[in-house]
Amino acid sequence: MHKPRLKFWDIWNMSFGFLGIQFGFALQGSTMSRIFETLGAEKDNIPLLWIAAPLAGLIVQPIIGYLSDNTWHKSLGRRRPFFLLGAILSSIALLLMPYSSAVWMAAGLLLVLDASINISMEPFRALVADKLPDSQRSYGFVIQTLIIGIGTWVASNLPKFMNNVLNISNEAAPGVVPESVRVAFIVGAVVFIGSILVTIFTTKEYSPEQMQKFEDGDEPEKDQGMIKTILGTYALMPKIMKKLGIVQFFSWFAFFAMWTLANPALTSHIYNAPKPQIEEFAQLDSEGELQYDADRVILFQDDQARLEYSEQDKSYNEASDDVGSKMGIYGLSSMAFALLLTFYTSRFAINRKLVHMGSLILGGAGFLLMYFIPGEPEMLYVCFVLIGFAWGSILSMPYAMLSSSVASSKMGLMMGVFNMFIVIPQIIAALGGVVFLQKLIGEESIHAMTVAGVFLLFAAFSNLLITDRKAIKYDPA
């Protein structure tokens, strides 16, 4: 028995929750390093502060995958209970994040936010495989990418929109997150839970009995318990997953470098507007600690120092708004890429491997170009358009290739285990990998973007390892 083909709006509605998920990820990706810098973090320490995000994924993803494979709620079904739980927790974390008063607080909330986003996200990947026949899976993952692109662009532009259009200030006292960023996070929280509710109320799931019929009546494997099942899946990983894992490793190392270091790298190299160090302008005691007045306001050396700090901080915040806005372009170009693939894959067969390889090469070129355009911020549009092609492919092609090679009954667990190849490179990068490689090239943080470009090229050519014909090609007929 085969699953029926779904109409466009059915696939759109079941993927719509990804809009909120991407609002969370995009606000995190475009503003967290800015928040860390605002709270006093050193540039070289920023990747380490991000380690909470991949650690949460490493632990949460396979557990949620297993639980969602083995859950059935009479009203919410198999995957939707996790959509709702993750949305509630993520929205709370988004509301609290911009009100952090210390680096440790922001890092802790980042852990909560990323773990909560993963609770919602992993079942969404599995839902595509649950609901769609193999001939529509690339189509389904591409529509998810289309929605992700919309979310990335809108969310990345929110702080700049709040300042330029709504006249909400992007300036604040030292150590305080600007009001424009705070309001952007509040909007993100509302969109997150709202879009998830759209999917919950418009999408029905197949029952376990129906899923068994779609598996040609095969008896489901006996459940051996969560820990044993997860460890067994790691041990008996399909070859296609291992090969795709190499591609994913290089891809996600590159994007982690972008999320953590693009803001300090580009504000310094392209805009010549680095974050000013408050210690250079404030009064310090004999031990080098900041001095405060009775209201806990930092004391400056004199009025001239206060003015210079304010001007430099204003330039930094304006540059950060612009970097975040231009980063959103990669969401738009990934959306355009997804739209093109949506129409094409609904009618014609594609070679997934070659599509993914070509997209990653373009993304690598986008990162490498950044080094050669100091003082030319408009050229960042070109860079992020190219990066968006890679991002659009990363969010769809590997999952489409994998889902064609594993059973639907284990799809949630497989997707969770597969994401090990997403979080491990990020952990390595956070523990000093990206900063170490950057400093092999030079001290300037822009070299982190060069590292990202080289790693995307490694990812592109790693696709040559993939030989599974079922994973590489599919026909919409």
What is the predicted function of each stretch?
Residues K353-S396:
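C-terminal transmembrane helical hairpin of 12-TM major facilitator-type secondary transporters
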Residues M1-W9, S101-G108, I117-S120, F124, ...:
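Intracellular loop-helix junctions on the cytosolic face of multi-pass helical membrane proteins
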